[in-house]
Amino acid sequence: MRKLLLLSALTLLIVSCKSTSATNTKVDNTKERLMRGEWVISSVSYVGSEYIKVQSFGLADSQCFQGSTWKLVANNNKGEMSLTKSDCMSFSSPITWFVNKDGQFVLKVLNAGEKAKKVRDGYVLDVANQTETSFQLIDMINVGGKSTNVVYQFQKN
């Protein structure tokens, strides 16, 4: 009997200590509703540094995202992003996205015709300073052993 109780307590302890993934948490509908619509990234900045060469979302230099357009549809968590800066490669892609209860923006960049469940890689960014006309996405990166934030400033289009 004692062994059974000990085994049950140990099992309960192991199950209760399991961490949750950023992509498996519940959705924050309030933040998502504020994000729906068409947006433009008005600036990309680096907290504590003037300029760092960063490849954002595995696509292009972070400065190429300045002026990019993002269409976010909240009712089905789909959308589209387009890089439009003249001195950078042009790129357009469907995306899936949502905001979890921790206030994190979860993003997957898809290839044309590709389903989100087939894409294994994605990005988790913090949401900050959200209003009806602007918000920030903050990506924490490691540069030379130090954590640095890349801040994408979105403005309603």
Positions of PLM-derived features:
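Single-stranded nucleic-acid nicking/binding segments centered on His-rich, glycine/basic loops
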Residues: 97
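Positively charged n-region of N-terminal signal peptides that target proteins for export
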Residues: 1-4, 18-19
